[in-house]
Regions:
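Conserved AMP-binding/adenylate-forming
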Residues: 21, 35-75, 175-177
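Adenylate-forming
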Residues: 98-99, 204, 217-229
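Flexible, low-complexity linker/hinge segments
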Residues: 82, 103-131
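Hydrophobic alpha-helical segments in the ANL/AMP-binding
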Residues: 4-5, 53-71, 82, 160-162, ...
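Conserved AMP-binding/adenylation subdomain of ANL enzymes
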Residues: 154-171, 181-220
Length: 229
């Protein structure tokens, strides 16, 4: 089994809410399918991710279509980003338009506030067992890369769903970037279970955050100790 392979069964259930706008699972799948029409399977791609519908749709598309995905946070050091791009030579990069201003002749396609840039046409020799690479925490120094296989991604997600008894009726809220393992895990488990994720950009100590907790009847949220400091 592959992660997200059963998203279609949830259809009109609410997958995501961002800035009071509702996205069903059908909406998420339709947005994800836009990328599969452009990017070939087994492509090597880099996602500079924000917690928003476009990054999540691109991530879901990457998993479903077998891209080998490197996920970076939107605050990733630019020097590290360019070095990573030079070393890995990805086929495509998907990034927020404000992240970098690249003036070159590469093919570019724009999706809302994002740019999909074609970098390298050559086919990559990729182990099909691999799925994604995440960076360790820390964006100003030289973070290390952590590789996750398709199998690990799926089994870990299913184990967490079963242990925490996450159900379709559950509603959670984002508190961490999806580029980090814990933030991504919260997204994976709730989407895989057919639950609802509130996309949030407010810090947990803000009034707006706790207003969302009340307004959306949030069941639970996950975070790390450093967030409270």
């Amino acid at each position: 089994m592959k992660l997200f392979s059963k998203l279609g069964i949830f259809k009109k259930r609410i997958a995501l809410i961002q800035d009071n706008k509702v996205y069903t699972y059908n909406d998420l799948i339709n947005r994800s399918s836009k990328f599969s029409k452009i990017i070939k399977k087994n492509s090597l791609v880099i996602l500079v991710a924000k917690n928003d519908i476009e990054s999540i749709a691109f991530y879901v598309s990457s998993i479903l279509n077998g891209y080998f995905l490197i996920i970076l946070d939107e605050n990733t050091n630019k020097e590290f980003f360019f070095r990573l791009t030079k070393n890995f030579k990805p086929n495509y990069i998907f990034y927020p338009k404000e992240y970098i201003d690249i003036n070159n002749k590469n093919q570019k396609i724009f999706f809302s506030n994002y740019c999909l840039e074609k970098i390298d046409k050559k086919n990559k020799v990729i182990n099909k067992k691999n799925s994604i690479i995440l960076t360790t925490s820390g964006t100003t120094s030289n973070p290390k890369l952590v590789r996750l296989s398709n199998h690990n991604l799926f089994t870990n997600t299913e184990q967490i769903i079963n242990y925490l008894k996450i159900k379709k009726k559950d509603i959670t809220i984002t508190t961490l970037p999806m580029a980090y393992s814990f933030g991504l895990s919260i997204l994976n488990t709730h989407l895989e279970a057919g639950a609802t994720v509130i996309i949030n950009k407010d810090p947990i100590y803000s009034k707006n955050f706790w207003k969302k907790i009340n307004d959306y009847n949030i069941c639970s949220f996950g975070t790390v100790p450093v967030v409270y400091q």
